[in-house]
Amino acid sequence: MSFVVTIPEALAAVATDLAGIGSTIGTANAAAAVPTTTVLAAAADEVSAAMAALFSGHAQAYQALSAQAALFHEQFVRALTAGAGSYAAAEAASAAPLEGVLDVINAPALALLGRPLIGNGANGAPGTGANGGDGGILIGNGGAGGSGAAGMPGGNGGAAGLFGNGGAGGAGGNVASGTAGFGGAGGAGGNGGLLFGAGGAGGVGGLAADAGDGGAGGDGGLFFGVGGAGGAGGTGTNVTGGAGGAGGNGGLLFGAGGVGGVGGDGVAFLGTAPGGPGGAGGAGGLFGVGGAGGAGGIGLVGNGGAGGSGGSALLWGDGGAGGAGGVGSTTGGAGGAGGNAGLLVGAGGAGGAGALGGGATGVGGAGGNGGTAGLLFGAGGAGGAGGFGFGGAGGAGGLGGKAGLIGDGGDGGAGGNGTGAKGGDGGAGGGAILVGNGGNGGNAGSGTPNGSAGTGGAGGLLGKNGMNGLP
């Protein structure tokens, strides 16, 4: 038995496009009709007259053929438009009885548990901070949380059923600029389906003098599912930027951890306002990678926020990268540490880079350390580079991560350059164990004096030692 799958909206869009093409061709034919069907003879002789008549005849034949083609095109567009309307009407007519069937199926579950068997949860109303409704017990996505009123937290996203995605958390409420108060925290994302489904993203923190933190991402499903991303921290206008929310954990068996939220920026009109720290990346499942850490927020008049640490894997998978530090007008934010690999196999996550420290005495942020590799196979994560000290010392480079039994150690991060102060020290390279080379040490940052170069990591039993960094 054959069947046809049709999308009425797509058919209607194609019909509209075809109508536009026909109109364009018709306009072009009309513009060309007069100069091509009445070709003037080049001279008064018989040959010129015959050639002009020949060309005019060809043009008239083309115009007649074009008229027939335009008629066919118009009929085809009408048929296509009518077909799209018929399919849409049939779809609407068949959906109504199905809704009644779903109501009958869901009624007992709603009466006993307050939750349908099949269907998506309701979204929280904006400005109320209400939580999103949970999805159907069997199949259904969680509803999104409602945004918060001024200074109030956003609602949490609803959880999914056995199959479905968690709802996104609502945004925290803002507080008007120049007004004292705390921004509302973003709502947490709902968890994914118990068996399959992704976690919902966390809500964004509210803008205020003391900004709200971003909401945590929801966890993925038990078997398969990606963790939700953490919400970004709100912008702080006088006190501090909000912290980024942590990424949700991946599914227990298969799934990547969610990315950590970005820290909120600190924008001070009076006093100082450091940037908020980035959120940590979520842990991966037994077979899955850890989520990357969120970047730290910028401190326009204050320190930059630290980058979030990368999430670690459980059994088989790479660790997440650490988030970069936020630029600060005084001290740059430190980079987040890279996540560790799974217990058996995987590479360690790279450490995040330290950020620039501005101002007359600005100090660069330190680079994050690289993550450790799995016990059997895997390379250590590279250390993050230290930040540049615009008016002060450079940041130290992060340490390279250790390798597994088979794998190379991670390279150490380079030290940041300092201006009128000491350069940052290079990070040491990570060591290898059995088969693999040690990581190279990070180069020293220039300054007054220069920093110390990082030492190379020890090589494995079957491997070479890493090279020391350049002084």
From Swiss-Prot:
Enumerate the residue ranges of region (Interacts with TLR2): 140-230
Cell compartments where the protein resides: Secreted, Cell wall; Cell surface; Cell outer membrane
Please tell me where this protein is predominantly located.
secreted
Q: Which Pfam families does its entry note?
A: PE, PGRS
Q: Which Gene3D superfamilies match?
A: HP0062-like domain
Top-level taxon in the UniProt lineage? Bacteria
InterPro entries in alphabetical order = PE-PGRS_N, PGRS_rpt
Q: Does the keyword Secreted apply?
A: yes
Q: Where is this region: Essential for translocation to the cell surface?
A: 1-30
GO cellular-component terms in the record? cell outer membrane; cell surface; extracellular region
Keyword Signal among record annotations: no
UniProt keyword annotations, A-Z: Cell outer membrane, Cell wall, Membrane, Secreted, Virulence
Every copy of the PE domain together lies at: 1-93
Subunit structure and binding partners: Interacts with human TLR2.
Spell out the family assignment given in the record's similarity comment. Answer: Belongs to the mycobacterial PE family. PGRS subfamily.
* Domain remarks: Contains an N-terminal PE domain, followed by a conserved linker region and a C-terminal PGRS domain.
Q: What is the protein's known function?
A: Induces TNF-alpha release through human Toll-like receptor 2 (TLR2) signaling pathway, leading to macrophage apoptosis.
The identity of this protein, by name, is: PE-PGRS family protein PE_PGRS33
Whose protein is this, by species? Mycobacterium tuberculosis (strain CDC 1551 / Oshkosh)
